[in-house]
């Protein structure tokens, strides 16, 4: 019975939509980008996505620093983000990617520009995408698992 439950969980995870955020690095006093990459499943097309981006205080980011990626642009989507300070995470950006009825293809749906202050200490910090929700072509909510990215300050 336990084996069936574990296998079922793996099957559900294998069939779900995912976002990926490859690791990135930045030197103190400079900027870099983080790509948010969408990995779709053809059996459940997505037309819109919303998420929260939790950025630690060691990095600097503004809502205007989050722009559409090439996959989102090819589907004629627009991206709107709102940022606020968060005592737990540092900065919190809430983003909605939507517009029209075209399905999101695989690829970068958002590009996040971030910077490390000149006095940033070397180390690794974690950026989190959480509370991710997709919207299907039938306008049904499609939960997407949270994801983290490691940012190395050199």
Question: At which residue positions do the language-model features occur?
Answer:
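Sec-dependent signal peptide recognition
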Residues: 1-8
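Hydrophobic h-region of N-terminal signal peptides that target proteins for export
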Residues: 8-16
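Acidic, low-complexity intrinsically disordered segments
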Residues: 15-154
């Amino acid at each position: 019975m336990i084996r069936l439950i574990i296998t079922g969980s793996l099957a559900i995870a294998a069939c779900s939509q995912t976002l990926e955020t490859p690791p990135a690095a930045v030197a103190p006093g400079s900027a870099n980008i983080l790509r948010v990459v969408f990995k779709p499943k053809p059996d459940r097309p997505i037309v819109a996505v919303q998420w929260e981006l939790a950025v630690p205080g060691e990095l600097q980011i503004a809502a205007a620093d989050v722009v559409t990626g090439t996959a989102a642009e090819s589907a004629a989507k627009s991206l709107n983000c709102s940022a606020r300070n968060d005592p737990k995470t540092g900065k919190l950006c809430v983003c909605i990617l939507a517009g029209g009825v075209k399905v999101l293809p695989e690829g970068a749906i958002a590009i996040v520009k971030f910077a490390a202050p000149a006095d940033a200490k070397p180390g690794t910090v974690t950026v989190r995408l959480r509370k991710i929700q997709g919207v299907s072509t039938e306008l049904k909510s499609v939960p997407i698992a949270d994801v983290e990215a490691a940012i190395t300050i050199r």
